[in-house]
Amino acid sequence: TWMKNAAKRGARIVLADPRITDIGRHAWRTLQFKADADVAMLNALIHTVIDEGLVDEAFINDRANNFEALKANVMGCSPEAMAPVCGIPAETLREVARAFATAKASMILWGMGVSQHIHGTDNARCLIALCAVTGQIGKPGSGLHPLRGQNNVQGASDAGLIPMMFPNYQRVDNAGAHAWFEEFWGTQLDEAPGYTVVEIMHKALAPDSDPHKVRGMYIMGENPAMSDPDLNHARHALGSLSHLVVQDIFLTETAWLADVVLPASAWPEKTGTASNTDRMVQMGRRALNPPGDARPDLWIIQQIAQRVGPHAPHFVSSLPPEGAGPALGRPGGGAGLNWNYEGEESGVAAVYEEMRQAMHASIEGITWDRLERESSVTYPCLAPDDPGQPIVFTDQFPTPTGRLQLVPASVIPAAEKPSAEFPFVLITGRQLEHWHTGSMTRRSTVLDAIEPMATASLHGDELARLGVQPGALVGIRSRRGMVQVRVRRDDGTPRGTVFMPFAYVEAAANLLTNAALDPFGKIPEFKYCAVAVEALPSTKGD
């Protein structure tokens, strides 16, 4: 893999994770911090950089605001003070901070372990601050790289598939952005941000008197009956709907609850683009026809639009020539919504052209014809002859001042701490063989043969204390639910902690998780909740 090859070439990899995973074998140093102590650990690193005179003064003076507030905030966060909080020796924290600050280039890559906490936004703010105070932004080999959850999450976010954003990360409640998109689409747009997934589930169970009660859902390519926190609550919400439509390539657990299932096509069965975390817009070409009644998502959406009702406004069917200004969405007369676009594959090239105009500040120079020739182009790319900019933030940031705003973060405990009744911390996540909720990988006979059943990983000392052997059946219980699962010995999992993948419907880890949200990003705390682990009578001592 990329990381292993980098280690072989001499790159110093630091693994920061409550669990020691396989990549730890290739790491120069491992920071195995306590599961909710991200901010404590990161503030200690920032403190060391400032305390030992390793700050990139030119970067801070020329390109960042609020440094003095950040400095004051971490004043009491020395490695010696934070070591008992985060569980990492002070000298190790100092060593890693020095190495990060003095390297020619340092970068940070992170996954869902950073964001899936009630302090997930603060975790990200600390990572940004660490890169800023060391000047590790805007130069080759540096920067912050959030590894997105799956293919084209980046592209979907870029295109505005976020409840509080228009395309290109223009806020819905920003008056200027709102006016621009109303003119672009030729229609009135709601001024209020939408709900996130967990908030939608709450609204599905709201009283009938709530004017914002959710009574129906149309779910595409998502499996919230497995992926949402506190699944008993989420499944109850889905089951209470007046109407549920699920559009997916397989009959998922969510589809089991649906009134209507629309069979969609898989990635090789449609043409379109995907963007990754490196900001590469990539062309994907249809290689196969969809099986049976399955159809591409775009075709399904267009057919639904045509049938929404006789009094719906009519929309123009194609974009005007480039440079002539937007026209799609101007109301006319007629029945239904005409969301058809001219061209092959349901007009996918015209849809992309609309997106290119909506995201003109990022992908204006990446035309459909260019993608067909080059297959992928990196953005920002603002002209047809622009090769794309693989390095961003070289001289300014996309803020009103062009400068980075540093935001101090304080240590915030998890929403739910262990207790005498629930003494373990549960961490959920993925595993190598099964992706997310397993809707695809568990249908792969090879992968399912390698990992055919749900397991819970515990340290060997915890198995001994419970009086069970690897492979024994245990009950894991939280304040929200209980599952029975086989245990696996994993000494990389810290004592007092359980790790479970969430891919298995027969032992759905999210029956246990807490729906507490980060107040800014509105992401649930999948990475921390309190549970009890109990040896079942029939297996204890086996």
Identify the role of each PLM range.
Residues 25-33, 263-265, 269, 280-291, ...:
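Short beta-alpha connecting loops at secondary-structure transitions
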Residues 55-60, 107, 138-145, 312-322, ...:
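Flexible, glycine/charged-enriched surface loops at secondary-structure junctions
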Residues 240-243, 249-272, 277-283, 473, ...:
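C-terminal, active-site-flanking charged/polar segments
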